[in-house]
Amino acid sequence: MSRLRTVSGKRLEDLLAAAPDALEADREMRGQIQKGIGARWYAMIGVGVASLLRCERFVYDLRGPLEKSFAVQLAADWTKLSLTDEERAILSYTEKGTLDEASVRRRDVEPLRQAGLADKDILLIAAAIAYHNYLIRLAAAFDVMPS
C-alpha cells in the first residue's frame, strides 16, 4: 500500500489513478517517449536513472525488454558493458542529466550528435531522462513501484 490513504495499490499507476488526468498525462508522455526512442533505449535510461538515484529495487521493474543480467550489469557499471556508440552517449548524458542537470551545456549534447543522433532523438532522450527522474522519485516518495 502506498503512503496515501486513498491509494491501495503498489504501483505508480494506482497512485496516479487518484488524479485521473495525471494518470492520462503520464501514460501519454510515456507512450510518446517510448515510441520515439524505442523500448531498449527507454529501458536503458530507466535502469540507469534508477541506479544513479540509488533506487536499485526498481531496476527489475524498469528493465522492459532488457535481459535481467544485462540490466543488473547496466545498473552496477554501464561503462563495462559492450554497447554501441549511441548507447554509450545516451548513458553518459543520462548520468549528467540525473546527477548534475543544472550543469548540462551545449557541449554535453555533442557526443550524442557524434554518435549519429538527430535533434529529435536528443530531445526525446532528454525527455526520457527527465521522465524517469520524475517517475522514480515519485515512486520512491510514495513507496510504490514505478510502472
Regions found by a protein language model. Give the residues of each.
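Hydrophobic alpha-helical segments
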Residues: 1-147
